[in-house]
């Protein structure tokens, strides 16, 4: 006769008050305050290091069990958050809201219409665009890319339609087969409304900016734009990056801050030319070990993420790194100084900034070590 599985450990539900709302959290009865903080991180976006839990007027000590501090089923706990110690865009509160991109665009367009009359593209001579190779239509109250643009064909090197209300990029983008820079920042482009098939036909493209749109995913076909050197996808709602991003061997700059990215594919190690990466204000808990393959990396910002450690031998492998921003993560200066290769990294960045240090004015100018001090005991 088979023995029955052991019963699950007993649990309690704690009512946590934070940001104008009450959050019920189920935890094992034997849990510690540190365990409760880890459970609260995805529910509040506040890093455990930035949480102070108070029950019945007493601060809960991390290492102590909840039961030893008289926290029982139904207990009410108040969460106080340290400023700046959060992942993503900020702590999740009752009144947290991000204005819909379409609302923001509509407001921008309305202001533009007040300041100037609508751009009458039909009166703009496409011949001038062809002569200069540049189409500059930013802040032009556009809801779509004008048809006249596609007729310019291979004459165009730069297309800038940023800060409009454009909702789609059609297949006709393929007609701009000599395009090098495509600036689509601050529009209303959502998943499925951009012809990636058309974009992959533009093999001359080196700069693509899709920041401040409504993207949730990027397709695998992104990896087919093989000459891309700069990719800007900040301020969207991206939850991940496609595995195929590792095919972008020439990519030098990746700006993907203020999204909802929870993990990175290990294939990112294939982006061997990367020298600047901004992944700040996302939901990352770790960086893949393959980050160590980025031997040309000079600047990395992962501010306001849930990171607790760096890849092994990160400082040793990324031997050109001189700028690192880990503020608002679980990695403090004390932790950072224990990482192998930190001394060499510190020497490189201090050498770069030596002139600033030599000519600093007053005692308030302090060299930024790249991470926070440990606030846990404040």
From Swiss-Prot:
InterPro entries: Leu-rich_rpt (IPR001611), Leu-rich_rpt_typical-subtyp (IPR003591), LRR_dom_sf (IPR032675), LRR_domain-containing (IPR050216), LRR_R13L4/SHOC2-like (IPR055414), Ubiquitin-like_dom (IPR000626), Ubiquitin-like_domsf (IPR029071). GO terms for biological process: intracellular signal transduction. It comes from the Eukaryota. Residues 85-120 are annotated as: Disordered. PROSITE patterns: LRR, UBIQUITIN_2. The keyword Lipoprotein does not apply. Residues 10-86 form the Ubiquitin-like domain. Disruption phenotype: No visible phenotype. Keywords: Leucine-rich repeat, Repeat. Residues 93-106 have a biased composition (Polar residues). Widely expressed except in panicles. The keyword Cell cycle does not apply. LRR repeats lie at residues 129-152, 153-176, 178-201, 202-225, 226-250, 252-271, 272-293, 294-317, 319-344. Belongs to the SHOC2 family. Leucine-rich repeat protein that likely mediates protein interactions, possibly in the context of signal transduction. This is Plant intracellular Ras-group-related LRR protein 8. It comes from Oryza sativa subsp. japonica. The gene is IRL8.
